[in-house]
Amino acid sequence: MNKILILGGTGMLGNAIVRHFKNNNNYEVHFTYRNEKVAFENFNKENAIRFDCLNDNILNLPKNIDYVINCIGIIKPFMYNDIKNSILINSVFPHNVSNWCKNNNIRMIHISTDCVFSGLHGKYNELSYHDALDDYGKSKSLGEPKNKCMILRTSIIGEEIHKDASLISWTKSQKGKEVNGYLNHFWNGCNSGPKMI
């Protein structure tokens, strides 16, 4: 049975991945959380690890893991709430995880973003030059580990389990109101879908 550690298991993507793998008997799922109330309203305490990537030492995480999926990150709308911590989380922390995984022979999957690309050139692929123009895209670009790991550059949409900060939550709250959108806009995102992993 493969053991998976999901870093950021109570975020939008992380909780979807925890739920997906918990329903599969081929995996033993562990996940990290920061807020106990959020974590245990939605999951049981089994295999849950309190971990704050800014204050806790990654060396204290369990090492008998086969895969680490890094879902920890500051999303674009919150980037400027604390720019220093956003850069530490998006740009520095993934390299710490990557080195820890390498030293412990753990396979790493790092969730990045398609925002490492500006969108000006279109039809990007995994070898395309990162040309982000904003701080968020640049922070995520800097955070892509160079050690051997799988990097998924995607855009997700879904609901947060602990706050009404997502686009879907906002759209649902607009019941009866006109909501503006886009025409002829290409988007290749996922609905917080763990199946991409």
Question: What residue spans do the PLM features occupy?
Answer:
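N-terminal Rossmann NAD(P)H-binding glycine-rich loop of SDR-like oxidoreductase domains
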Residues: 3-24
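SDR active-site strand-loop-helix element
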Residues: 7, 32, 68-72, 108-114, ...
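N-terminal Rossmann-fold cofactor-binding loop
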Residues: 30-40, 53
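NAD(P)H-binding glycine-rich loop region in Rossmannoid oxidoreductase-like domains
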Residues: 45-89
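Conserved catalytic-core motifs of eukaryotic protein kinase domains, centered on the activation segment
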Residues: 78-84, 119-122, 163
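Glycine-rich NAD(P)-binding loop of the Rossmann-fold in SDR/ketoreductase-type enzymes
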Residues: 81, 85-96, 130, 138-141
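Conserved Rossmann-fold NAD(P)-dependent oxidoreductase catalytic core, especially the SDR/UDP-sugar
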Residues: 95-131
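NAD(P)-dependent short-chain dehydrogenase/reductase
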Residues: 133-134, 145-197
